[in-house]
Structures are given as C-alpha cells and as structure tokens.
Amino acid sequence: MVKSVLAGLLAAVILIFGSIIGADLALRSTMQVDLIGTAAHAISLTQPVNKDEIVTNPFDESYEMKDVQDEINNSVANMITYSEENGYWVNFTPSSAGMKSMISLSDKQVGALASTVIKQEAAGQVQIRDLYMDIEIYQVEFEKNEEGNAIVNSVIGINTTSFKSIIPDAFPLANIKNIIPDILYISSTNEVIKGEESFEYNVEHVDFTINNLSKEQTESFFYTLDTLMGVGSAEYINVQIGTTLMHALVGNGANKGLAYSLKEYGAKDFNFVQHGSDIYFEVQR
C-alpha cells in the first residue's frame, strides 16, 4: 500500500517536472522564452531587499518641499501652497505677473517636487500599457551632464497588485504570479535629451533593474512576460517611468509640469546645469 502511494507521488512529481521542462523547451524553440529562468528570477524577487543599497540619495519629501516652495514662490508668487489638510499643492496657473528669477532645484528637491506633482496630477501612478500602477519615489539623482542633457536615475517602489491581476491563473504563469511581491523596488535610469525647440525633451533607456536582479536578469524576466502577455519590455517600462518623471518637471500641452506651465509667465526653457560637483534642474527666463 505504502509503496503504491509513494509510486503515485513519484509519478506525479515526474509528470509536473516533465510538463515544466516540456513547456520550457516549446517556448524556447518557438518564442525564445526561458520559462525556467523566469521562474528562477521570480523566486529571487521574494528575497529581502536592502533598501539602503538601492536608495543612495534619499530625500525627505516634507523637508525638501519647504525649500522647493521658497525657491519657486520667490520667482512666481503663490505657485506652491501648503495646508494641514492637503499638504503641498502646485498651482499651475498662479495669479502672478510673471517669473521674477530663474528657478534652480537640486536632485533631492526635484524628487520631492516630482512626487508631489505625480500624486496631484496622476493619482500617484505610472501608466504601463493599459495598467495604472501606484508608485512611491525614493530617489532622484542626476549622474551626468552634457550640453544640457542629463542621465537621470530614479528609485521607486511600485505596487504590483494591478499587474498581478491580469496574469492568468493558468500554467505556466500562475506560479510566477503567486510569488511576485506586492512591492517591487525599481532603479530606473534614462538619458533626458533636450529637443531643438524650447521645452522639448526625449527620454531614452539606459539601465533598468528590479529588486536584487541584474540588468540582464530584469530584461529576461520582462521579455518573458511581454512575450506571453504583452506587458511591455524592460526598456519600454523604464522609459515610461522616466517620461512620467519628466512630465512632472517640464510637462507639455497634454501633461502639467513645472517648466512648461511657466511658459506664459516668462519661462524660456529648462536645462540641467552643473555648479561644482552638483547638477541642478533649472527653469530659465
């Protein structure tokens, strides 16, 4: 009796293992998808993340926003207000005669401002395809400055609830769905390239990692999910995050942002400018 039960269990294990291997081989040959590797990456995502190793340039939003308020309001009166009930609020159509001076913000101040604007204008979310995912910004850092362009790194926490809701409850993705954490730590690095016209910018992919995965592992993980579900590649998601950040800082006709909203108040353009060892985001007049 015991032998027959053990034999049955062994047969079941062999069947499941064989199914995974079979599916992996089929997907490798038809779609170049590494299902076993993706499952291993998903398991790695469950490991503890040392946030201090990822967030190397943290900011205190309340502390930094006080300085942001002073800097911006000294140029454009009452553009940023504060109340106990609503916190900081950016008025993109202030009752002001115009800009009195250039606005200059450090990377930490940019992080605080971007966080405030994204909460205010985008419900604290980033759009990935048809999904809207809650985010929290932990870091913004300017890594390089060339001819007004910059390499901009942001570290965010992203809530995966809406993403996991669209993963099928069927083999082979069901097991991956069940072990993806509710919060992923994303390090997003893009190059912001100024356009030929004032206030124009393009965001180009540089580097993108999640939790403890390397760049290559992150790309492989999202390649599988994109191939099977159409969620977007690592490069696409990275650019979406970088673009959301730049919409808050600069903006355009469709997206409210600091620099573009001040065009009618005397703003000429935005720029990334280096002073000593520090790089600043500036709204010029």
Spans of features found by a protein language model:
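Extracellular/lumenal and peripheral-membrane lipid-interaction modules
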Residues: 1-285
